[in-house]
């Protein structure tokens, strides 16, 4: 199942990027989303 492995890998990459951004720059959603 290469498709399954590829999907799992993409999910891990996206999750890693999301958490990296979230922890680097704490969420200010609604307050200053213009920047």
UniProtKB/Swiss-Prot annotation:
<comment type="subunit">
    <text>PSII is composed of 1 copy each of membrane proteins PsbA, PsbB, PsbC, PsbD, PsbE, PsbF, PsbH, PsbI, PsbJ, PsbK, PsbL, PsbM, PsbT, PsbX, PsbY, Psb30/Ycf12, peripheral proteins PsbO, CyanoQ (PsbQ), PsbU, PsbV and a large number of cofactors. It forms dimeric complexes.</text>
</comment>
<dbReference type="GO" id="GO:0031676">
    <property type="term" value="C:plasma membrane-derived thylakoid membrane"/>
</dbReference>
<keyword id="KW-0472">Membrane</keyword>
<dbReference type="InterPro" id="IPR037268">
    <property type="entry name" value="PSII_PsbT_sf"/>
</dbReference>
<comment type="similarity">
    <text>Belongs to the PsbT family.</text>
</comment>
<keyword id="KW-0812">Transmembrane</keyword>
<comment type="function">
    <text>Found at the monomer-monomer interface of the photosystem II (PS II) dimer, plays a role in assembly and dimerization of PSII. PSII is a light-driven water plastoquinone oxidoreductase, using light energy to abstract electrons from H(2)O, generating a proton gradient subsequently used for ATP formation.</text>
</comment>
<keyword id="KW-0602">Photosynthesis</keyword>
<dbReference type="GO" id="GO:0015979">
    <property type="term" value="P:photosynthesis"/>
</dbReference>
<protein>
    <recommendedName>
        <fullName>Photosystem II reaction center protein T</fullName>
    </recommendedName>
</protein>
<dbReference type="InterPro" id="IPR001743">
    <property type="entry name" value="PSII_PsbT"/>
</dbReference>
<dbReference type="Pfam" id="PF01405">
    <property type="entry name" value="PsbT"/>
</dbReference>
<keyword id="KW-0793">Thylakoid</keyword>
<keyword id="KW-0604">Photosystem II</keyword>
<feature type="transmembrane region" description="Helical">
    <location>
        <begin position="3"/>
        <end position="23"/>
    </location>
</feature>
<keyword id="KW-1133">Transmembrane helix</keyword>
<dbReference type="GO" id="GO:0009539">
    <property type="term" value="C:photosystem II reaction center"/>
</dbReference>
């Amino acid at each position: 199942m290469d498709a399954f492995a590829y999907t799992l890998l993409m999910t891990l990459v996206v999750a890693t990027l999301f958490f990296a951004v979230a922890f680097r720059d704490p969420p200010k959603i609604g307050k200053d989303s213009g920047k």
